[in-house]
A protein has these predicted regions:
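Conserved glycine(s) of the Walker
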Residues: 23
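An accessory alpha-helical subdomain
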Residues: 108-204, 217
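Conserved NTPase motor "head" modules and their coupling/switch loops across ABC/AAA+ ATPases, GTPases
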Residues: 1-19, 32-33, 45, 75, ...
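Nucleotide-state sensing region of NTPase/ATPase domains
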Residues: 32-119, 124-125, 131-136, 190-201, ...
């Protein structure tokens, strides 16, 4: 929509107004793009470049909670991406995602309420990616990847009808990572709950209040994940995938 735009938001609430088609969404999309390395409109990267232009560029300056200044830039030209953070080249776009904590609500965000559980897990984990940096070993992202890898390996072994010894090793890893992942999600839901309740009371007072809680993806109050995986092993062999665990959380 724009050839060039400078936007200088103030701390706190900023309201962007304009007629239909004036570019309000394009402005928000640029901010989202810099923080997520993708558009909230799906896989439309090539369509983001203005017709007749070789590339798009997004640049931002901000200060974090310690008042430390930061600078980030992203360039997309055809199939190539180039990014810089605080003057240094970025080796992978995830570094921009980590540096900029941006949560976007757009027309498709209603899926958080009426969509499948995958949308809600993604929302939780995106928040945790930014707030659980104290975990060590690269923080929450490393834990999430550890769980995803173990989950993928167990599924592969189930499809191969692997023996118990092979499954034991990966179930141990999956259980350890899965329990830790679930504890992170539970803490985050507890932190989010007051904001959800206050927001609902203000926006929809007639609804009678709201509450959020985490369904961990297995009967966690009855048995640890390691035991649940062992008990479900025969059924999961028939299914060819893991039927319970944090990947089924809601």
């Amino acid at each position: 929509r724009f050839e060039s735009v400078d936007f200088h938001p103030r701390p706190g609430f900023n309201l962007v107004t304009g007629a239909n088609g004036s570019g309000k969404t394009s402005l928000l999309e640029a901010i989202h793009l810099l923080a997520h390395a993708r558009s909230f409109r799906g896989r439309v990267r090539d369509g983001l470049i203005r017709q007749g232009q070789p590339s798009l560029d997004v640049f931002a300056e901000w200060r974090d909670r310690t008042d430390t200044p930061h600078r980030a830039g992203l360039r997309h030209a055809g199939g190539d991406w180039e990014a810089r953070l605080d003057g240094a080249p970025v080796s992978h776009l995830g570094q921009l995602c980590e540096a900029m904590a941006v949560v976007t609500f757009e027309p498709g965000s209603h899926a958080l309420i009426d969509g499948g559980s995958e949308q809600r897990r993604r929302f939780l984990d995106w928040g945790l990616f930014h707030v659980e940096r104290h975990l060590g070993d690269d923080g929450f992202l490393a834990l999430w990847r550890r769980h995803a890898r173990a989950h993928k390996q167990r599924n592969a072994l189930l499809r191969q009808q692997a023996d118990g010894a092979q499954l034991d090793a990966w179930e141990h890893e999956l259980a350890q990572a899965g329990e830790a992942l679930t504890r992170c999600r539970e803490r985050y839901v507890v932190q989010l709950a007051p904001y959800v309740e206050a927001g609902m009371a203000e926006l929809l007072p007639s609804a009678g209040g709201a509450a959020i809680a985490l369904l961990p993806g297995w009967r966690r109050q009855e048995l640890p994940l390691a035991d649940a995986l062992l008990l479900s092993r025969d059924r999961d062999r028939l299914l060819g995938h893991t039927s319970l665990g944090p990947h089924r959380a809601d």
